[in-house]
Amino acid sequence: VDDRELIARVRDGDPGAERLLYDRHVDRVYRLAYRMTGDDDLARDYTQETFIRAFERLEQFRGEAALGTWIQAIAGTVVLNGLRKVKRFRTREVELDESLAHGVSPRAPEPDLKEQLEQAIDDLPDKYRMVFVMHDVEGYTHEEIGSALGMPVGTSKAQLFRARARLRDALSDFAEEWAS
């Protein structure tokens, strides 16, 4: 059963078709959400929200892009908006923690390369991180990224270049320490 037939069946109210469509695309949506958040609970929440929105808006799907690309575009929006909310909450949480802190906290151990890389990716601006994860981690083409995120292919390429440059800069100190 192809996606077009599934869409027609979902529009006709077939719950089995909804489940099949969900099963066909859920892994890719979850992987993107997890790679962007690093948090299983948030990734599951964003995956669920993505499919709620996709099913609510299925009537608007025109078939100009592949269904999977359309769903990934929704996922990208859901994740980026969700991360903005989480970031605002965590910023307030840190400010509160700092206002309650007394004295000097013990020094944390130096992170290893994996932790450094994860932190460097987390520190990227949201759009750079999304393009980096979609291209270098998930294997999307720039055309698919452009379609999913509503940007020209050249913008996707430029953002990937900038993301990689920031990661190189962020990891250069670690590389110098390790080499000496």
Where are these regions (language model features)?
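Structural recognition of an alpha-helix C-terminal capping motif at a helix-to-coil junction
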Residues: 31, 45-52, 56, 65-77
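Amphipathic, Lys/Arg- and hydrophobic-enriched alpha-helical face
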Residues: 22-40, 57, 121, 173
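DNA-recognition helix of helix-turn-helix
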Residues: 80, 84, 128, 137, ...
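Arg/Lys-rich amphipathic alpha helix in sigma70-family domain 2
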Residues: 56-63, 73-94, 110, 173
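Internal acidic/polar
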Residues: 1-3, 81, 89-114, 141
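C-terminal edge and immediately downstream basic/flexible tail or linker adjoining helix-turn-helix-like DNA-binding
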Residues: 9, 91, 114-120, 133, ...
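Helix-turn-helix DNA-binding module
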Residues: 44, 122, 126-130, 134, ...
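A short, charge-rich alpha-helical start-of-domain segment used by transcription regulators
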Residues: 7-31
